[in-house]
């Protein structure tokens, strides 16, 4: 096992600035990819001096990954594959296929960053995972269809769903505004004050009546 200092976060291994022990083959990959340096005495001393800078850089990369995740969430991921009438593919969709699709859309996503929860051997809708950062994995929807006409129907269906969701949100917002305006313009309830006034009047009348009765009573 070799000790390396991680220059960036690596999922399942550690965060930027941490020292990790890995097999020689994996160490060579990390070193070549610029994700780690050898944990020599000099490098460890240098790490202690630059740890704050490394953490700042990691936070910056995480923020960038969050932006990519938001952008990816708005994409319509569709792969066209030949299949039998019952939807069974002639082959399967691989992580390389998804990586190429994302690259064609302008995202630099390597195959090793893509994973599936199941093997994709039929047409349909699937969840796929894309690792954008050691602390961030985006879950996306992938549609696998037989031909371009089906792909277009999927695009229209997604667009329709998005329009319906937007319309529902606008209606809900309008209802909230109307309810707030109605509440602000509601008259103050004076019934309680009126009732108190009537009760006070009745009390005064009863008191006056009792006094009259006492005056009319003959003396004995």
Curated annotation (Swiss-Prot):
Residues 167-220 are annotated as: Disordered. Keywords: Ribonucleoprotein, Ribosomal protein, RNA-binding, rRNA-binding. Residues 167-184 have a biased composition (Low complexity). The keyword Cytoplasm does not apply. Residues 211-220 have a biased composition (Acidic residues). Gene3D superfamilies: Ribosomal protein L9, C-terminal domain (3.10.430.100), Ribosomal protein L9, N-terminal domain (3.40.5.10). InterPro entries: Ribosomal_bL9, Ribosomal_bL9/RNase_H1_N, Ribosomal_bL9_bac/chp, Ribosomal_bL9_C, Ribosomal_bL9_C_sf, Ribosomal_bL9_N, Ribosomal_bL9_N_sf. GO terms for biological process: translation. It comes from the Bacteria. One of its GO terms (cellular component) is ribosome. One of its GO terms (molecular function) is structural constituent of ribosome. The keyword RNA-binding applies. Belongs to the bacterial ribosomal protein bL9 family. Binds to the 23S rRNA. This is Large ribosomal subunit protein bL9. It comes from Anaplasma marginale (strain Florida).
